[in-house]
UniProtKB/Swiss-Prot annotation:
GO terms for molecular function: 5'-3' exonuclease activity; 5'-flap endonuclease activity; DNA binding; magnesium ion binding. Residues 116-245 are annotated as: I-domain. It holds the Pfam family XPG_I. Its EC number is 3.1.-.-. HAMAP family: Fen (MF_00614). Residues 318-326 are annotated as: Interaction with PCNA. Interacts with PCNA. PCNA stimulates the nuclease activity without altering cleavage specificity. Mg(2+) 2 binds at D173, D175, D224. Residues 1-98 are annotated as: N-domain. GO terms for biological process: DNA repair; DNA replication, removal of RNA primer. Keywords: DNA damage, DNA repair, DNA replication, Endonuclease, Exonuclease, Hydrolase, Magnesium, Metal-binding, Nuclease. This is Flap endonuclease 1.
Amino acid sequence: MGVQFNDSIPKKNISITDLKNKTVAIDSMNIIYQFLSSIRLRDGAPLRNSKGEITSPYNGIFYKTIYLLNNEITPIWVFDGKPPELKLKTREERRKVKEKASKDYEIAKREENIEDMQKYAKRINYLEPNTVDNCKKLLKLMGIPYIDAPSEGEAQCAHMIKNGDAYCVVSQDYDALLYGAPRTVRNITASNKPLELMEIEDILKPLDISIDDLIDMAILIGTDYNIGGIKGIGPKKALTIIKNKKMNEYIKDIENYEEIKNIFKNPKVVDYTKEDIKLKSPNIEGLKEFLIEENDFSPNRILPSIKKLDKLLNEKRSQTSLDSWF
């Protein structure tokens, strides 16, 4: 969900070539939900294997990773750990939205209204118990690094950017900026939208605010830890409050204000080694078994893609070895 800054945050359109020779830290859960929304059948239903298990995330991860490698971009996928207690309310709100969408979908299905079926199906997104583990299994088989964050994935991504191990966070949300990420790129999963780059300095300097001010703006508007924020306050009004130094007048109306701010300013992150984020050789037979035998992907599509993945990773590792000599 994330904070809804919308058009109040300056962005600039970039090309995929602008990320060439760079490493990106991917907010995995955010992007996986994007795959669940976008990779669907004509009636809005997600892709499933013969056992009835949803496979849209595996499709998205496999082909998007190859797309990034083909554009000379190194991905590191970062998965959420245990969420802060304050986020439980957000999950309950999402559950209610999905329940209503499920009922609306069934009505549209009975009426054979394909357009409404597609609309409501995209709101039902949910992860099956083994989906995340299988996504990690797929990445390991592909030879692609991933990190398990202790808590929020965006915070871990931001930590990796600040460490110099990645150039930007890849996410549809703005939250990574609140954790101090210097750069976030949006729309990497969208085929019909330009990539959007948000740089923290290009946000703070023109607005003449600090990162603390940006966090306060987010809390006024509403975050995953205080859904809805303060009634009647959107991005423009929040900025006015901050610029006029009026934040203290609103703190008393914000439950758990200090705890929320501390989540953003002092997030839980995990240390990692260079080996943890290194590209490795793909397990070709393992990929065939997982994608084709276990999840019913078409061999005609998968086999050439596995071959391409192997070629791209070999080229990448060869280049890395060559660079280490100079």
